[in-house]
Structures are given as structure tokens and as C-alpha cells.
């Protein structure tokens, strides 16, 4: 089977009425799946449905500074996700970014294959259909484009599409702007802990004896979720937490993102002029669990294509030791909940756990006479 035939987009375009078994989620996962459009419509019609918090951070630069810090702190602690208004990302830049990403995915699959990655060889960046193994052994209903977007001098620009021509300049512009936004949010989140505003960013970057520090890394992943004939059986991205410190998300207006809160899945609504921000594992570790790395997933739709742009803000892979901030453990305030690890070690440990869970699931299935798909 060729790479083109392996792409989820190719399956969608083939007008199949069923989906291959490797995309059918386990029975226990399917109880609350459904068409993203229908699920979002039901949530919108339910006046009592929980809503992800909306926080305007433009107030941080004015008289509303204290209230802004408190609102962000509460959202990070109670939800681990929030809609951010007043983020300072110009609407025209976001429109150009969306247009460029959608134009890339509108290209023939064979043309996109020029940027194909090779996870088996350790090359995760590029165009692909799966980033990592999962516990169930099932595949996700998405294709994607994944590459470093900041700092620019570390990026492999051979993975940045030459077509459309707008892709490179707008992605570079967007990456720099999100980097500035990340610093602002980390400052607000530091103050929410009762610590100096530079604390979290400083601990996410390396400082050696010469005062030199590594920059934060921003990875851009464009998720492309084609139409799916059985959205009640498949997911775009399965339930997971991000390994990053923060994740910034915008989309093409089609719903699908869900966050797990208080024992239920809450659908992210379309909040005009906002972007979604997730707290990731790295920040949860630094704050010793005060800020929550949100469990989330993405549904798919029978009638609509969903595209989302996610920027993962990450510490350098090996030069920073992630561990709970000592300031939060002082004077017997608490015990560390996380062992010290580099970011690379954390990612590897999480991947190993996924593989181990999959092996255990396969072994259990085999013992019951079931052949894992």
C-alpha cells in the first residue's frame, strides 16, 4: 500500500460508507462519541452545559491586572484550558495563516507527500498521519503537518511548504507573535502562584554560569480532520494531555475540541476573537499539580472538514530539568509529586507508557482469543 493510500484524506475521498477496523475505537470509548457538529449543537442548546472559561488578558496591561491574574489562575487550576481574548494576535495574520494552511491541504495528496515524515526512522516533523503509538493500537482520523516554527534559526525550512507561497512568511510571522504571547501568559501564570512574573519562563529555559539561556521551542501542528462516514466510531485525536508547557489553538470554525472536566467531556464553543490555550505537562510538573494539564480530544464530522492550528510551547529537550518549583514546596507546603526529568526524558517516558499499555492490551486480548487489529 502506498503512502497516498494510507492517508486519511484518501479514505475520506473514496466515499466509503464504513471505516477500516483500525480506526474503530474500543467499545468503552464509543459511548459518548458522535458527530462534532451535532455534539456542539446539543451543547449550545443546553443552558446548563459547562463552558470553558473565557479570559481577556488585555486587562493585564491596565487597571484590571489583578483581576486578570486571578481569572487566568482559576482557569489554569480548575480547568487547565481557557479561551483567551485580548491576545494581541492580529486578525489579518490569523486569516492569512488559516488560508495558507488550508491551501496546503487542498493540494493533491501526492504533492503533499514531498514533505512526508518518517516516524519509524525518528523523523516526526513533516506531513503525516500519526505521531505516536497509542494504548489501544487504534489509528486516529487525521492527517497533519508538523514542524518547528520558532526559533527560526533552528527550523528545518525544507519541511515548510513552498506552495502556497504565503505559507513560509505568515508562519514565521505567526511563530514570533505566539512567542511573545507565551511570555505574557507565563508571566500572568507566575503571578497567579504568588511568584515573580519571570519565574515560570526562567525555569523553562536553561541558564548556565555565563547567563546564557536556550529559547523556548514552538512546534506548529496543523491538524486536518477529513469528513468521516462514522463519527460515532472514530476520533480525530484520542484523549491525551500535551507534553508542552502551553499549547495555543485556533481552528477553521468547525467544532470538535473537547476538554475533560468534572468527569464529563465539555465541547469548546466558538468564542469570537479568542484562541484556546491548554496547560500542558511541563507546567503541571513545575507547579506541582497546581495548574492542570488538561485531558482533551477531538471529534470528527460526517459533513464538515475541521482544520486546527496548534502551537506547542516547549522547554529545550535536554538542558532544563523539569521538577516542582522549590518555592511551592517551602516550609512544608507540600511534597513533590513529580520526579526530576528533562523534557526529553518526560516525552520518552510517556511514549514508553503508551507502548507498554498497548502491549498489555494486546496480551489481554490474545488471552481472550481475540486477535488485536
Swiss-Prot record:
Cofactor: L-ascorbate; Fe(2+)
Pfam families recorded: 2OG-FeII_Oxy, DIOX_N
UniProt cross-references to SUPFAM superfamilies, sorted A to Z: Clavaminate synthase-like
Sequence ranges assigned to domain Fe2OG dioxygenase in this UniProt record: 216-315
EC numbers for this chain: 1.14.20.4
Residues that, per the record, bind 2-oxoglutarate: 306
Cofactor binding, per record: Binds 1 ascorbate molecule per subunit. Binds 1 Fe(2+) ion per subunit.
Binding site for Fe cation: 240, 242, 296
Enzyme superclass (EC): oxidoreductase
InterPro entries named among the record's database cross-references: DIOX_N, IPNS-like_FE2OG_OXY, IPNS-like_sf, Iron_ascorbate_oxido_reductase, Oxoglu/Fe-dep_dioxygenase_dom
Catalysis performed (reactions): a (2R,3S,4S)-leucoanthocyanidin + 2-oxoglutarate + O2 = a 4-H-anthocyanidin with a 3-hydroxy group + succinate + CO2 + 2 H2O
Molecular functions per Gene Ontology: 2-oxoglutarate-dependent dioxygenase activity; L-ascorbic acid binding; leucocyanidin oxygenase activity; metal ion binding
Keywords: Dioxygenase, Flavonoid biosynthesis, Iron, Metal-binding, Oxidoreductase, Vitamin C
Annotated pathway: Pigment biosynthesis; anthocyanin biosynthesis
GO biological process: anthocyanin-containing compound biosynthetic process
Function field: Involved in anthocyanin and protoanthocyanidin biosynthesis by catalyzing the oxidation of leucoanthocyanidins into anthocyanidins.
Recorded family membership: Belongs to the iron/ascorbate-dependent oxidoreductase family.
PANTHER family the UniProt entry points to: 2-OXOGLUTARATE (2OG) AND FE(II)-DEPENDENT OXYGENASE SUPERFAMILY PROTEIN-RELATED
Protein name per UniProt: Leucoanthocyanidin dioxygenase 2
Organism: Oryza sativa subsp. japonica
Lineage start: Eukaryota, Viridiplantae, Streptophyta, Embryophyta, Tracheophyta
Gene that specifies this protein: ANS2
Amino acid at each position: 500500500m502506498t503512502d497516498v493510500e494510507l492517508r486519511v484524506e484518501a479514505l475520506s475521498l473514496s466515499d466509503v460508507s464504513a471505516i477500516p477496523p483500525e480506526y474503530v475505537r474500543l467499545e468503552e470509548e464509543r459511548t459518548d462519541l458522535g458527530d462534532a457538529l451535532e455534539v456542539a449543537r446539543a451543547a449550545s442548546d443546553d443552558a446548563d452545559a459547562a463552558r470553558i472559561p473565557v479570559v481577556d488578558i488585555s486587562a493585564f496591561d491596565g487597571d484590571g491586572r489583578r483581576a486578570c491574574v486571578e481569572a487566568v489562575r482559576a482557569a489554569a487550576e480548575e480547568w487547565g484550558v481557557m479561551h483567551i481574548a485580548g491576545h494581541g494576535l492580529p486578525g489579518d495574520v490569523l486569516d492569512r495563516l488559516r488560508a495558507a494552511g488550508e491551501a496546503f491541504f487542498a493540494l493533491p495528496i501526492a504533492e503533499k507527500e514531498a514533505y512526508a515524515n518518517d516516524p519509524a526512522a525518528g523523523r516526526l516533523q513533516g506531513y503525516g498521519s500519526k505521531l505516536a503509538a497509542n494504548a489501544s493500537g487504534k489509528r486516529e482520523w487525521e492527517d497533519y503537518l508538523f514542524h518547528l516554527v520558532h526559533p527560526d534559526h533552528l527550523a528545518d525550512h525544507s519541511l515548510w511548504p513552498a506552495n502556497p507561497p504565503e505559507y513560509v512568511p505568515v508562519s514565521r510571522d505567526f511563530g514570533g507573535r505566539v512567542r511573545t504571547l507565551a511570555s505574557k501568559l507565563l508571566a500572568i501564570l507566575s503571578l497567579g502562584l504568588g511568584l515573580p512574573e519571570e519565574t515560570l519562563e526562567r525555569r523553562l529555559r536553561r541558564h548556565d554560569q555565563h547567563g546564557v539561556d536556550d529559547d523556548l521551542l514552538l512546534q506548529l501542528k496543523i491538524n486536518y480532520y477529513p469528513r468521516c462516514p462514522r463519527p460515532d466510531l472514530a476520533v480525530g485525536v484520542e484523549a491525551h494531555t500535551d507534553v508542552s508547557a502551553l499549547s495555543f489553538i485556533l481552528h477553521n470554525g468547525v467544532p470538535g475540541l473537547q476538554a475533560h472536566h468534572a468527569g464529563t467531556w465539555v465541547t469548546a464553543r466558538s468564542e469570537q476573537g479568542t484562541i484556546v490555550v491548554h496547560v500542558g505537562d511541563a507546567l503541571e510538573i513545575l507547579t506541582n499539580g497546581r495548574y492542570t494539564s488538561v485531558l482533551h480530544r477531538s471529534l470528527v464530522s460526517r459533513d464538515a472538514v475541521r482544520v486546527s492550528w496548534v502551537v506547542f510551547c516547549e522547554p529545550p529537550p535536554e538542558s532544563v530539568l523539569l521538577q516542582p518549583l522549590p518555592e511551592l514546596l517551602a516550609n512544608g507546603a507540600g511534597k513533590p509529586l513529580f520526579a526530576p526529568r528533562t523534557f526529553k526524558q518526560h516525552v520518552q517516558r510517556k511514549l514508553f507508557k503508551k507502548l507498554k499499555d498497548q502491549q498489555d492490551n494486546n496480551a489481554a486480548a490474545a488471552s481472550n482469543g481475540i486477535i488485536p487489529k
